[in-house]
Structures are given as structure tokens and as C-alpha cells.
Amino acid sequence: MKLSTNFTLFGLNVKAIQSYLKEQAKDRRGVRVTRRGDLVYIITAYTAFKLPAVLYPDVIQPVTLRECPADGVTIISAQYGFEVEDNAPDLVDIFKNHAPNEKPVERTPFLQDIPTGKKKSGLARLFHIGTTPILINTDYDSMVNPVQFTYHGTTRGYSPVYAISASDPTISVIMLPIKPTAEVEVLCKKMFSE
């Protein structure tokens, strides 16, 4: 698996984001997009993005093939492209509720092989808060340039990683974790205990 490193637009890897969203949009209700004021929120099953609306044409429109939704309108992936979703959940509240920002998260250079089923495997990047490991799929991790983002999370349960652009805090990504194995938990305790 070759990880893309094509970072543009405030540290976002636009090609990786578009590729991921196109794959998720193949599922009905796989991708939701809403606009609230000058911000656009994009939510999938495993990631969420908050971007300034001015970035929508460059980052999201090639996936949705639609203009940016009007303020308060949500569009959703459907059988034949994206359509307006009536009675949509409030994506802004969902984003805010799942954006842990209690503690700084350390991103490590370590990758963990993870089974994905059907004799396949994938890679996860090891993040940690103290001795608490957080594994994030490398596909999600490759969507942002680690030099241009700060990471936050919490040690309660399996914390998502909340990446915030250092140059523009209105740009952020939430990445859901993978449950670490007992081996990873032991290793993390040994490596990062003080």
C-alpha cells in the first residue's frame, strides 16, 4: 500500500480526501454534507471534516458534483449521486460532540498491521496520550500533513483523534480509532511510561 503525500490547501491531502469520500459515497447515506454559515461539515461513518466553505469547490465538489449546499441544507450520497436530505440530523452538533479536545495526542512513526477480514490486512498509525494507545487507519492519517496539524483526544474509551490545522483552526478532521490489541497496549505502556 502506497501512502499518498500530496499535501496542498492548508496541509490537506486533497487527493486522499477525495478518493476516500468517493469510495464512501458508493454507499447510500455514506457521506453527508451540510453548510452552516461560512463552514461546511462532511461526515462519514469513520471520519468527519470541518472546512471553510471557500474550500468546497476544490476539495468536496469533485466528489458531490454539486454546488455547495445553501446555509442549513444537508446533502447526502444516494443511489444516483447526492440529493438534499429532508429532516437531516444536525451535523454541526454531531461534529462538536465527537471532537475530543481535552488532551494533546502524540503521533508516532510506528505502524501496526491490522486484519481487515477476507485474508486482507491494513495499516494503522499509533497515536498515544501518555500510555494510552490510539490506532488510526493510515488512510485517514494520510489525509492531513502532520507538520501542519495538532492532534487532540481523550483517554476515556477509544478516543477519536481530532486534528486541527495550525494555520487555520476552522479546518479540522475527526478520525475514528481502531481497537488496539493487548500487544499494542502493553507495548505502548512500556514505550511511553514516565
Please place each PLM-identified region on the residue numbering.
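Intrinsically disordered, low-complexity linker/loop segments enriched in Gly/Pro
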Residues: 1-37, 41-51
